[in-house]
Every structure is written in structure tokens, then in C-alpha cells.
Amino acid sequence: MSNTIKMVVGLGNPGKEYEQTRHNAGFWFLDELAWKWKASFKEEKKFFGEVARAALPDGDVWLLKPATFMNRSGQAVAALAQFYKIKPEEILVVHDELDIPCGRIKFKLGGGNGGHNGLKDIQAKLGTADYYRLRLGIGHPGDRNLVVGYVLNKPSTEHRRQIDDAVAKSLQAIPDILAGKWEEATRFLHSK
């Protein structure tokens, strides 16, 4: 049986100055997944980002960290998906989520973009919202005028620990997600 997910995308912004910011939670997840799968990233200009191929027993899974900055993430996702003939429903996008308490996780297929510029661009470039999302809660600053500064700053030590715990828990659900066991993955990820 082959994997139902053929590409995992972590969203973030490239560059040292953004490395530890909340908006890069998707990159944090992907770095841990690549380490777990012993896959190495290398820059691929034709895919507008860093790409790693994980050779798994049930087939290859491509890992992608767009180097386009958040609001142009779709350019990288669409380039890799088109080249390897990966359908939107075979893509998992991992990203930070303001509307979920810090350290909580939500998993879903499709839906709105919640104002997330990375998701907006992916939807525009793929022509559909029907791809899977793993949403890592980073919490909300409480005032929409503070959002940009909030996502582009480092979390507190406590919040970073909560996000790291959410990443670790999410990694445990990846085998079910790859196997298409959506209900099992959702139940596990949504539990406290």
C-alpha cells in the first residue's frame, strides 16, 4: 500500500532572523521530521525552496521548506507538486495557527485560510483548498493590530516548550496520516 500523503510542506520564512519566530513553526516541524526519517534538505532553485526526499517503505515522501517567504509559499508547493504529479489531496501543509491556543494541534482537510498568507497563496496556486493541514497552535496576542509583530517574534520559553511538545506529538501521528487513517490521527492530535 502506498502512502496517501506524498508531500509534506512546512511553512516559514527563510533567513536567520526568522528562524526562531512563531511563524516558522512549520519549519521546526519539518526539521524534526527530516531528522526522524534521516532525510537531508538541499536547496532546489527550480522548486523555490529546500527539498528532501524520504525513502520510506511505502514509497517516497517529499519534504519542502519554501524559500519564497510566507506570502509566496504556493509558488514552491505548486512547482514541486506539478513536477512529481502530486495531487492537492496528497499534500500535508504544516503551519502556525493564531486561532488555536499555544501547544494545541488541529488536523483537517480543506477549509478556509484563516487569514494565513501562506495558505492563501497555496490555495491560489493549486486552485483548490483541498489539501491537508496540520495546524500548530501559537496562540493569539489578543489584538489583531499586534498580530504581525507577534508572529514575527520569538515565543517565550514556556510557549516554545509548548510548541515543541506539539511538534513531538504531531510526529507521533505521521504514520497514521501517511496511511490515510484520518480519524485515528485526528482523535490523537485533538486530544489533550
Swiss-Prot record:
Q: Identify the residue position(s) of the site Discriminates between blocked and unblocked aminoacyl-tRNA.
A: 13
Tell me where it mainly resides: cytoplasm
The UniProt entry's GO biological process terms, in alphabetical order, are: protein quality control for misfolded or incompletely synthesized proteins; rescue of stalled ribosome
Q: Which UniProt keywords apply?
A: Cytoplasm, Hydrolase, RNA-binding, tRNA-binding
Question: What GO terms fall under cellular component here?
Answer: cytoplasm
Q: Which GO terms describe its molecular function?
A: peptidyl-tRNA hydrolase activity; tRNA binding
Q: Where in the cell is it found?
A: Cytoplasm
Site feature (Stabilizes the basic form of H active site to accept a proton) residues? 96
Catalytic activity annotation: an N-acyl-L-alpha-aminoacyl-tRNA + H2O = an N-acyl-L-amino acid + a tRNA + H(+)
Q: What is its EC number?
A: 3.1.1.29
Q: Which PROSITE patterns match?
A: PEPT_TRNA_HYDROL_1, PEPT_TRNA_HYDROL_2
Residues at the catalytic site: 23 (proton acceptor)
List residues binding tRNA: 18, 69, 71, 117
Family in the record: Belongs to the PTH family.
Q: What does this protein do?
A: Hydrolyzes ribosome-free peptidyl-tRNAs (with 1 or more amino acids incorporated), which drop off the ribosome during protein synthesis, or as a result of ribosome stalling. Catalyzes the release of premature peptidyl moieties from peptidyl-tRNA molecules trapped in stalled 50S ribosomal subunits, and thus maintains levels of free tRNAs and 50S ribosomes.
How this chain assembles, per its entry, is: Monomer.
**Matching HAMAP family, A to Z?**
Pept_tRNA_hydro_bact (MF_00083)
Q: What is this protein called?
A: Peptidyl-tRNA hydrolase
